[in-house]
A protein has these predicted regions:
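Bacterial N-terminal signal peptides
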Residues: 7-17
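Compositionally biased alpha-helical segments
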Residues: 20-138
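Solvent-exposed, polar/charged alpha-helical surfaces in well-ordered, non-transmembrane soluble domains
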Residues: 49, 53-54, 74, 78, ...
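Active-site-adjacent structural elements in enzyme catalytic domains
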Residues: 135-138, 142-234, 327
Length: 376
């Protein structure tokens, strides 16, 4: 009997000796150690809480510690079951989860911002036709500067309408997206030419403008091209507007595709039975922080001793972007509008000028209101 029992014990001991030593010595949650030395630091009264592919977390006499498994010596790495491949897989999964979470957050923020913008836009439209409250001043220029949307120079091509539309579009897009993005006037010039199958004639030296009209595209033609062809970032088709060049090279198919999928823009003519009503509605838009592209009669350059449209006789047509107004009396007829021009920052007040209500009520032709729509 004793001999048989002794044989069983020996067999058990032999079987135990065949088990991997590493398994018997593996550290994991619940493992208690009198001490654990990692590098130059010795932790005492250690109790392991968690072990994952990257780290081990444990309690010790003086608090809590989290150590990367990759920083352990090989013997401890083996005891904690460190596997570099498993760590890499865990890191990849973590990064993917972070990107997915960021994408969901960005989409939610964009959706909330779009809903808010739409609500504000609809509220503004509901005010059209009602008397607009004229404030002392509404000035979007500081926000334009903050977004680095400075006055551009159209060069010698008759493209003022393109620049006026793009200026308004860049601003409302930046307000909606939260970050500024510059768009390609070069592309929109090409697109407008495609839509109406014509090119404008080159503008002469503005210092001797006289009767030389900026006879390019009408605002309605430009916004038709915008709705038809879209618009890409400026980086996709940089502006190459020269001093005399009048023809724009066609963009690549890829750029056209990008432009058409870059979002949809709804275009509205500012309503009004007359220019006085239109200007009243423009005040509503500016109060809501929405710039307006306008087409108006324009005086001879020699008659503009200051960047102010007041009582000069008109000589030709031009397009600019209204970005604010001043009205110290609160009466619409005493308003002076602020506009952004496309003749460079050296013109006027850093590229901006002014137009009295009296001038615009007589000479305003067109006023365009742009509305961003959700991307498909």
């Amino acid at each position: 009997m004793k001999s048989r029992l002794f044989s069983v014990i020996l067999a058990c001991l032999a079987l135990a000796s065949l088990l991997p030593a590493a398994e018997a010595e593996r550290y994991g949650p619940g493992t208690r150690l009198e001490k654990l030395t990692i590098g130059a630091t010795t932790y005492r009264d250690v109790r392991v809480k968690t072990v994952n592919a990257r780290t081990v977390l444990f309690l010790h006499r003086d608090g809590m510690a989290s150590i990367k498994l990759s920083e352990l010596d090989p013997a401890l790495q083996e005891k904690f079951g460190y596997d570099p491949a498993a760590e890499a897989e865990s890191d990849a999964a973590m990064q993917a989860a972070i990107k997915e979470r960021e994408a969901r957050t960005a989409a939610a923020v964009a959706q909330r911002r779009a809903a808010q913008n739409q609500s504000q836009f609809d509220a503004m439209l509901r005010l059209f036709g009602t008397p607009a409250p004229c404030r002392d001043e509404v000035d979007l220029r500081p926000r334009f500067r903050e977004l680095e949307l400075y006055a551009k120079d159209q060069g010698r091509r008759p493209s003022c309408s393109v620049f006026a539309v793009v200026s308004a579009l860049e601003f409302i897009n930046a307000q909606s997206a939260g970050t500024p993005e510059k768009f390609s006037e070069e592309y929109l010039i090409w697109a407008t030419g495609r839509v109406i199958q014509r090119l404008g004639t080159a503008v002469q030296d503005r210092s001797q403008a006289g009767d030389d009209a900026d006879t390019g595209y009408a605002l309605t033609e430009v916004v038709t091209a915008l709705r038809t062809y879209g618009i890409p970032p400026e980086s996709s088709m940089p502006n190459t507007i020269g001093r005399t060049k009048n023809i724009t090279a066609a963009p690549s198919t890829e750029v056209i595709t990008e432009a058409r999928t870059n979002g949809q823009v709804a275009v509205h003519l500012v309503p009004g039975r007359d220019t006085a009503t239109q200007l009243n509605n423009i005040i509503h838009a500016l109060n809501a922080g929405v710039p307006i592209a306008i087409g108006t009669a324009w005086p001879r350059f020699s008659n503009m001793r200051a960047a102010l449209l007041n009582s000069q006789p008109p000589a030709y047509n031009h397009a600019v972007t209204l970005v604010g107004y001043r009205c110290p009396t609160g009466k619409l007829e005493d308003t002076t509008f602020i506009f952004k021009n496309s003749w460079g920052a050296a013109w006027g007040a850093n590229g901006y000028g002014f137009a009295t209500y009296r001038y615009l009520v007589q000479h305003l032709h067109t006023a365009i209101l742009l509305e961003l729509q959700d991307r498909p």
